[in-house]
């Protein structure tokens, strides 16, 4: 059976606390922090974007395995913040890691589930013998308008997953998707920041799709929450995934390991995949994982995954784990944050 052969993540080391953002905009710091259950969020450095984050995640994945990049036949990168409107991120990353000329490459978009959509397509290509291995990446330097609620959560990070049939460390037993036309969140071409339809964000958007996809895949597999050792959902904030888990009947010990948003914010396309990466960092043979992503617009991808015995010989230690990167931090104030995120616009002669 096909599944994850290796994986790697990258999280920028810079952080800003919600209290610092609230201070600038005259909001109640404790109210903002507790309202979204975010303690800090990651901030990309001035020289970091989706391409560099994806390269680092991909390299970390390759450090943990003996896979020759020439054997990777496809690379798909999901993101809301590709650095170019016309020029693929996938070709940049493919060149950086040494993939061959004969390569399937494309950038994906479906809000925050573009990365998991890439995983599904890579799995299908492996299963149909079109490729031996394929790499799916979910990565973002997400945007939030200054002073908007999204500014408190929109962060940066990404994860790469290589899928194949040889030396699989986590079998993908089944994957399904759900989708509807829901106007919960959007950004038009040329606009710097997204807008959100607040009344569509919760129940009609996130909860309908995440809970619906989770229930559908468990129904088809005849499983129940107690059959899983871990569960991870898309994490727009710290409260939505915990509420979804409780509605479905999961316990805190099942979702705690993959819940990373309180410490690094919402990495958008990287969110579910990085939460899954954190789980794989500590998983053991036989562990069963339910992963459900969410993308505004709207849709969810659900995965039923089983960790194999190959995890015992897998070199997780060759690249930093998610928790280690979460702990390697440098806090910045709003002035530096504004500079890094280019909120401050300089004249032509200034840098």
From Swiss-Prot:
Sites where the protein binds (3S)-3-hydroxy-3-methylglutaryl-CoA: 28, 112, 153, 201, 234, 243, 266, 296
SS bond partners: none
Catalytic activity: acetoacetyl-CoA + acetyl-CoA + H2O = (3S)-3-hydroxy-3-methylglutaryl-CoA + CoA + H(+)
BP GO terms, sorted: farnesyl diphosphate biosynthetic process, mevalonate pathway; isopentenyl diphosphate biosynthetic process, mevalonate pathway
Role description: Catalyzes the condensation of acetyl-CoA with acetoacetyl-CoA to form 3-hydroxy-3-methylglutaryl-CoA (HMG-CoA). Functions in the mevalonate (MVA) pathway leading to isopentenyl diphosphate (IPP), a key precursor for the biosynthesis of isoprenoid compounds that are building blocks of archaeal membrane lipids.
GO molecular function, one term: acetyl-CoA C-acetyltransferase activity
Catalytic residues in the record: 80, 112, 234
Top enzyme class: transferase
Entry EC number(s): 2.3.3.10
Statement: the UniProt record of this protein carries the keyword Transit peptide: no
Top-level taxon of origin: Archaea
The UniProt record lists the keyword Acyltransferase: yes
Protein family according to the UniProt entry: Belongs to the thiolase-like superfamily. Archaeal HMG-CoA synthase family.
Database matches in Pfam families: ACP_syn_III_C
Sites where the protein binds CoA: 199, 239
SUPFAM superfamilies in alphabetical order: Thiolase-like
Recorded metabolic or biological pathway in which this protein acts: Metabolic intermediate biosynthesis; (R)-mevalonate biosynthesis; (R)-mevalonate from acetyl-CoA: step 2/3
Protein name stated in the entry: Hydroxymethylglutaryl-CoA synthase
Keywords on record: Acyltransferase, Isoprene biosynthesis, Transferase
Organism of provenance: Picrophilus torridus (strain ATCC 700027 / DSM 9790 / JCM 10055 / NBRC 100828 / KAW 2/3)
Record text on subunit structure and interactions: Interacts with acetoacetyl-CoA thiolase that catalyzes the precedent step in the pathway and with a DUF35 protein. The acetoacetyl-CoA thiolase/HMG-CoA synthase complex channels the intermediate via a fused CoA-binding site, which allows for efficient coupling of the endergonic thiolase reaction with the exergonic HMGCS reaction.
């Amino acid at each position: 059976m096909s599944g994850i052969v290796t994986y790697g993540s990258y999280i920028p080391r810079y952080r800003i606390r919600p209290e610092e953002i609230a201070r600038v905009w005259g909001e109640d710091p404790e109210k903002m922090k507790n309202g979204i259950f975010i303690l800090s969020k990651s901030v990309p450095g001035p020289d970091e974007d989706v391409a560099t984050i994806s390269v680092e995640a991909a390299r970390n994945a390759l450090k943990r395995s003996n896979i020759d990049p020439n054997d990777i036949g496809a690379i798909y990168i999901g993101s809301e913040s590709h650095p170019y409107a016309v020029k693929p991120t996938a070709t940049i990353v493919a060149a950086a890691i040494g993939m061959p000329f004969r390569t399937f490459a494309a950038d994906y978009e479906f809000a925050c589930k573009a990365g998991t959509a890439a995983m599904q397509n890579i799995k299908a290509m492996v299963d149909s013998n079109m490729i031996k291995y394929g790499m799916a990446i979910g990565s973002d330097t997400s945007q939030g308008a200054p002073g908007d609620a999204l500014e408190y959560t929109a962060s940066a990070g990404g994860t790469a997953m290589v899928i194949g049939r040889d030396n699989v460390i986590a079998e993908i037993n089944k994957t399904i998707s759900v989708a509807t036309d829901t106007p919960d969140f959007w950004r038009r071409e040329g606009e710097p920041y997204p807008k959100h339809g607040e009344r569509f964000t919760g129940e009609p958007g996130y909860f309908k799709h995440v809970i619906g996809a989770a229930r559908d895949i468990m129904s088809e597999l005849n499983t129940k929450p107690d059959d899983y050792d871990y569960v991870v959902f898309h994490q727009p904030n710290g409260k939505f995934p915990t509420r979804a888990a409780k509605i479905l009947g999961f316990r805190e010990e099942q979702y705690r390991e993959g819940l990373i948003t309180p410490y690094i914010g919402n990495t958008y396309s990287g969110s579910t995949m990085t939460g899954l990466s954190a789980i794989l960092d500590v998983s053991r043979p036989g562990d069963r994982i339910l992963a459900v992503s969410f993308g505004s617009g709207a849709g969810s991808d659900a995965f039923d995954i089983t960790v194999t015995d190959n995890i015992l010989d897998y070199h997780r230690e060759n690249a930093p784990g998610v928790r280690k990167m979460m702990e390697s931090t440098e806090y910045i104030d709003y002035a530096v944050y504004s500079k890094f995120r280019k909120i401050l616009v300089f004249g032509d002669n200034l840098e």
